[in-house]
């Protein structure tokens, strides 16, 4: 696996359940189209899997 992941929040969470909104916020996103670099670990991968339809993920 890659050591880091580049996450980009690409789609709005309007109409999504509150749990998915909380997951986006817990990943550290504040604005749409924001990109973050996160360490690749099972916890982050689990969060990504819950909101994969809202994110674009690249391995670095």
Curated annotation (Swiss-Prot):
Disulfide bonds: none
Cross-referenced InterPro entries: Ribo_uL30_ferredoxin-like_sf, Ribosomal_uL30_bac-type, Ribosomal_uL30_ferredoxin-like
Alphabetical UniProt keywords: Ribonucleoprotein, Ribosomal protein
Top-rank taxon, per record: Bacteria
The keyword Glycosyltransferase belongs to this UniProt entry's keyword annotation: no
Biological processes per GO annotation: translation
HAMAP family: Ribosomal_uL30_B
Family membership noted in the UniProt record: Belongs to the universal ribosomal protein uL30 family.
Protein name (Swiss-Prot/TrEMBL): Large ribosomal subunit protein uL30
Species of provenance: Syntrophomonas wolfei subsp. wolfei (strain DSM 2245B / Goettingen)
């Amino acid at each position: 696996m890659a050591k880091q992941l580049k996450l980009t929040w690409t789609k709005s969470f309007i109409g999504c359940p509150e749990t998915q909104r909380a997951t986006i916020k817990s990943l550290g996103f504040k604005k749409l189209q924001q990109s973050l670099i996160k360490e690749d670990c099972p916890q982050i991968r689990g969060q990504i899997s819950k909101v994969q339809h809202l994110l674009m993920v690249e391995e670095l």
